[in-house]
């Protein structure tokens, strides 16, 4: 198995912790991303359903597409009213022109846009919304970016390197002549309050650490814990600056006749 594929499929090993400590999106980001008239939504690479459940509070019908059966099992158990199905963004098990919105939360970098974008266009109704969101630590803050250096010193050389990696990950690249218009971006800052123990558990749910050798993983998490404790309160609580980066576009209307393009 290639290294990229091993990392992409590693999250099921920590599915319960992933669901417990990974952040969900802030309401302001959802207000911006999800159109008010969205009645049927597809969540690609839905994981354990953190974004799925936020969608379900706004949308009548949500189809969660997730390839990892371990992640999907947690999603199904925690997400009443959601249809959870096996599948990938490059081959969606969803009928043509059946969704008002297709969303990808913190997973666009795992997709092949050349194959996924035509699939998304296929399942969207005319005028339907493609929304992409990443909710993560705000690496614009120096000490937050430095956490990446501490937990993975071989992969990240500086705080600016951590920020550059994140910018590349947040780049939504569409194939030539995609059937989308009204492209827009926005970001939303907020603060997440949690214990240091939970923050360390959160860092441990990232693929680079899941797939790292045990000794390297333990050392990286120990360094991160030490840095977090320096900023925590006496009872071990820390406020972590967060950012939701959002991207959206609307599907152009299909020609009056002929197959969807």
Region spans (language model):
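Class I SAM-dependent methyltransferase SAM/SAH-binding core
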Residues: 48-91
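Conserved catalytic/acceptor-binding region of the Class I
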Residues: 115, 121, 125-192
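A short SAM/SAH-binding and catalytic strip from SAM-dependent methyltransferases
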Residues: 100-114
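Residues at the starts of beta-strands that form the adenosine-phosphate
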Residues: 40, 61, 129
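Conserved class I S-adenosyl-L-methionine
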Residues: 1-45
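A short acidic, Gly/Pro-enriched loop at the edge of an enzyme's catalytic core
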Residues: 90-101
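Conserved Class I S-adenosyl-L-methionine
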Residues: 169-261
């Amino acid at each position: 198995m290639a290294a990229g594929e091993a990392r992409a499929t590693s999250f099921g090993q920590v599915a319960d912790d992933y669901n417990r400590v990974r952040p969900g999106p802030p309401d302001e980001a959802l207000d911006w991303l999800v159109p008010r008239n969205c009645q049927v939504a597809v969540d690609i690479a839905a994981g354990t359903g953190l974004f799925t459940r936020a969608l379900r509070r706004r949308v009548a019908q949500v189809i969660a597409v997730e390839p990892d059966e371990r992640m999907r099992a947690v999603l199904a158990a925690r997400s009443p009213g959601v249809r959870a199905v096996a599948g990938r963004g490059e081959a969606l098990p969803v009928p043509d022109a059946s969704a008002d919105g297709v969303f990808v939360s913190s997973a666009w970098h795992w997709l092949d846009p050349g194959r996924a974008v035509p699939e998304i266009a296929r399942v969207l109704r005319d005028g339907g919304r493609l929304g992409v969101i990443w909710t993560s630590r705000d690496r614009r803050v120096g000490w937050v970016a430095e956490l990446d250096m501490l937990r993975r010193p071989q992969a990240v050389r500086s705080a600016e390197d951590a920020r550059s990696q994140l910018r590349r990950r947040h780049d939504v690249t569409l194939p030539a002549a995609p059937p989308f218009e009204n492209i827009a971006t926005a970001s939303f800052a907020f603060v997440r309050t949690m214990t240091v123990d939970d923050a360390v558990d959160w860092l441990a749910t990232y693929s680079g650490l899941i797939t790292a050798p045990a000794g390297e993983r333990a050392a990286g998490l120990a360094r991160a814990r030490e840095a977090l404790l320096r900023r925590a309160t006496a009872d071990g609580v820390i406020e972590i600056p967060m950012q939701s980066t959002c991207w959206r576009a609307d599907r152009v209307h299909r020609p009056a006749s002929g197959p969807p393009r």
